[in-house]
């Protein structure tokens, strides 16, 4: 009898064997019913379903509620809707959770997950803090801000500066409004008229204007209108016409100085680094997109509002400095730039970028300058 040789089983590649085993396991479980099948596939559920619930952030802005209705609320509402329940950002206005002066510390400690502010106002411990907010004559138009960040190295400088700070991530900087001085009873028609005026103002521009006797005063944002009414403040040097009308300060102030020492406020978004790390990539991208949307909203709101209210606004009388006084302010700003540039090599890089940008815009001519 001839022996019949049994075929020798082929050895499976370990990887292929693993795949087949997985398939057998799946088919076995599938036969147990729909409920068991659903239970066996939860490992492939979307990212958010693996969490205990939606990611929740607390974001505080430098602005009060009337202004916040334009400079950030539309963005946060849009983000929360688009996040589809995966993430919710709770929005707080100036001083609601922490005092504005404590914004940075609260962000760094994780009390806040994100902040919208400028460096100078929230006292960021970086050597470029002076450039946040209003830096005298750094800009003429709102588009100058994103152009400086994209083409003149400011983005890299900001990233470098915040890389040195634990637990804080800089996300983006955009433009706000130009800076004007609004007063209650004392019109400014010369530099001498600034002497002794107590104004609610931003740090860097306030420091520069104190050269002419202006006295910057810091109080909670919500107290400004009452302080103007009681005489605690003589005016504000904190914003442009659009904000002055929107938040009610134009109802209290009677005079507006049309000269502007800078064309746009530098405002930024920051995140607590551990909080940012917990956000999945698609929600990070969504948040950054919503920031860009907010930058665009503000650019249009301010650009249209400033011109319209200067021409059609009837709540304040416009005043202007004499040409000789204004020329002195412009000339004094050059020394102020050099003073700030000398504070650190990084600050020097920012001022060098401002000078290069200003030179380029002047050479380009109309409509740039």
Locations of the language-model features?
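N-terminal secretory signal peptides
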Residues: 1-25
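N-terminal secretory/targeting leader peptides
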Residues: 19-21, 25-41, 46-145, 160-164, ...
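Short, solvent-exposed helix-to-loop capping segments enriched in aromatics
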Residues: 156-157
